[in-house]
C-alpha cells in the first residue's frame, strides 16, 4: 500500500446545479475510508452564467482560449468552489492542514473528442490560493493527447469499489452513473475494464422541464409519472448513429437535444425522456464484453423513481437486476466527488487515470495538473 492521503473531491456536472463535495482516505489504489460528503447548490444567477458559458465556449478552437466573458465565468466558478470548500471544512470541523489535496473537476463547457478538444473551466491555481490546499485539476487533457476520448474517468474508482461489493450480488455487475450524461463501467475477471458513455442521462429531462416550467429538474419524477411513453419519439432518438457505432465514444451535451415545444405534452415528454435514459443504457450495454446480471446505479438519476422504474423494467426483460448504489453499501450521491478525490491521489502517484478499455487511449496514462498552495 502506498502513502494514504486525505483528499477532497469536487464535482460540478452537466446539470450545472451545484457542487458535490466528498472526503476520501485513499492511497490511490484502495479505499481506506469514506469521509463526509455534501452538496452546495449554485445561486440561480451563477447557474445562468454557466449556461451562457456553454454558448460562448462554442467559439473555442484551442483549449486554453477563454473568449468573451468565459474568463470571468471561470473566475466566478472557481470562487464558488473555494467558498464551498471553506464552508464544508468548517461544517465538518476540518482544518486546512487535515487535507492533503483537492481533486477539482471544474465545469465542462465543451467536449469534442473527435477534435481532441475538451474544456473544463476552473482555475486550479486560484482554488489552491483561496483554500490553502494543493489542487490537482485538468485531469482529462492528457488522455486526449494520447488518443483517448477524455471520458469517462470514473471507471478507475468503480474498479476500486468493486472489491467491496457485498456477497449475494450476481455478477458480472455494471456500475451505471446517471448524471447529465450516463456512463457504464464493466469490471470483469482479473480487473478487465470496459467503460463508455451510454447516452443521455438526466440532461434532456432537465432541459425539457426547465423550458416548460422554469424548474431545474423533475423532482421525484412527478411530472414523468403522469405521462406516457411516446414510442415514436424514443425510436427517433435510438436511430442516432451514437447507438450503432462499433467504436464507443464520449458525448457532449450538444449531441442530443430535447423535443421541440408542442411536439408532445409536458408529462409525456418527461416520461418518454425518462424511458430513453433506460433504453440508452441497455442498448449501450450490449457492447460490453458480456451481459450484466446486476446494474448498480449511482448519480442523481437514481433518485428519480421513474428513471429507475423504466430501467428496471427493461433490464428485467434481459434477466438483470437494477439496484441503487446504497443497496450495495455505497453512497450513490457522493460517488463522483469521491472519484475525483481518488483520481487526484492517483495523479500524485503517477498512476493511470484512464485505460484502453475506458476511453480508447492507446495505453494506460496518468493525468492532471498539480498546483501547490
Swiss-Prot record:
InterPro entries cross-referenced by the UniProt entry: Anhydro_N_Ac-Mur_kinase, ATPase_NBD
Keyword terms, alphabetized: ATP-binding, Carbohydrate metabolism, Kinase, Nucleotide-binding, Transferase
The keyword Nucleotide-binding is assigned to this record: yes
Enzyme class, first EC level, given as a word: transferase
UniProt entry tagged with the keyword Transferase: yes
Binding, ATP: 13-20
Pathway of action: Amino-sugar metabolism; 1,6-anhydro-N-acetylmuramate degradation; Cell wall biogenesis; peptidoglycan recycling
This enzyme's EC code(s): 2.7.1.170
GO biological process, one term: 1,6-anhydro-N-acetyl-beta-muramic acid catabolic process
Top-level taxon: Bacteria
Reported function: Catalyzes the specific phosphorylation of 1,6-anhydro-N-acetylmuramic acid (anhMurNAc) with the simultaneous cleavage of the 1,6-anhydro ring, generating MurNAc-6-P. Is required for the utilization of anhMurNAc either imported from the medium or derived from its own cell wall murein, and thus plays a role in cell wall recycling.
Family to which this protein belongs: Belongs to the anhydro-N-acetylmuramic acid kinase family.
Protein name: Anhydro-N-acetylmuramic acid kinase
Organism (species): Agrobacterium fabrum (strain C58 / ATCC 33970) (Agrobacterium tumefaciens (strain C58))
Lineage: Bacteria, Pseudomonadati, Pseudomonadota, Alphaproteobacteria, Hyphomicrobiales
Amino acid at each position: 500500500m502506498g502513502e494514504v492521503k486525505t483528499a477532497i473531491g469536487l464535482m460540478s456536472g452537466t446539470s450545472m446545479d451545484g457542487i458535490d463535495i466528498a472526503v476520501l482516505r485513499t492511497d490511490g489504489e484502495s479505499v481506506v475510508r469514506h469521509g463526509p460528503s455534501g452538496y452546495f447548490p449554485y445561486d440561480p444567477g451563477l447557474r445562468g452564467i454557466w449556461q451562457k458559458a456553454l454558448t460562448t465556449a462554442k467559439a473555442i478552437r484551442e483549449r486554453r482560449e477563454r473568449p468573451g466573458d468565459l474568463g470571468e465565468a471561470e473566475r466566478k466558478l472557481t470562487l464558488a468552489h473555494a467558498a464551498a470548500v471553506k464552508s464544508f471544512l468548517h461544517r465538518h470541523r476540518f482544518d486546512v492542514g487535515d487535507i492533503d489535496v483537492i481533486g477539482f473537476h471544474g465545469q465542462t463547457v465543451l467536449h469534442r473528442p473527435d477534435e481532441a478538444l475538451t474544456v473544463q473551466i476552473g482555475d486550479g491555481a486560484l482554488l489552491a490560493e483561496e483554500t490553502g490546499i494543493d489542487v490537482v485539476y485538468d485531469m482529462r487533457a492528457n488522455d486526449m493527447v494520447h488518443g483517448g476520448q477524455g471520458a469517462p474517468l470514473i471507471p478507475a474508482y468503480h474498479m476500486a469499489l468493486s472489491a467491496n461489493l457485498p456477497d449475494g450480488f450476481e455478477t458480472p455487475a455494471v456500475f451505471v452513473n446517471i448524471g447529465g450524461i450516463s456512463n457504464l463501467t464493466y469490471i470483469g475477471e482479473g480487473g478487465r475494464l470496459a467503460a463508455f458513455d451510454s447516452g443521455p442521462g438526466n440532461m434532456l429531462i432537465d432541459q425539457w422541464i426547465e423550458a416548460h416550467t422554469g424548474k431545474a429538474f423533475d423532482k421525484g419524477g412527478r411530472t414523468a409519472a403522469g405521462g406516457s411513453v411516446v414510442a415514436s419519439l424514443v425510436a427517433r432518438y435510438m436511430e442516432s448513429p451514437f447507438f450503432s457505432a462499433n467504436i464507443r465514444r464520449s458525448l457532449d451535451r450538444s449531441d442530443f437535444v430535447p423535443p421541440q415545444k408542442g411536439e408532445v405534452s409536458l408529462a409525456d415528454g418527461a416520461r418518454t425522456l425518462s424511458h430513453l435514459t433506460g433504453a440508452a443504457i441497455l442498448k449501450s450495454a450490449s457492447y460490453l464484453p458480456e451481459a450484466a446480471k446486476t446494474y448498480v446505479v449511482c448519480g442523481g438519476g437514481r433518485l428519480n423513481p421513474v428513471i429507475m422504474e423504466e430501467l428496471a423494467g427493461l433490464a428485467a426483460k434481459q434477466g438483470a437486476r437494477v439496484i441503487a448504489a446504497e443497496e450495495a453499501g455505497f453512497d450513490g450521491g457522493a460517488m463522483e466527488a469521491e472519484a475525483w478525490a481518488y483520481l487526484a491521489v492517483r495523479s500524485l502517484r503517477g498512476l493511470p487515470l484512464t485505460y484502453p478499455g475506458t476511453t480508447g487511449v492507446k495505453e494506460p496514462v496518468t493525468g492532471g495538473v498539480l498546483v501547490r498552495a
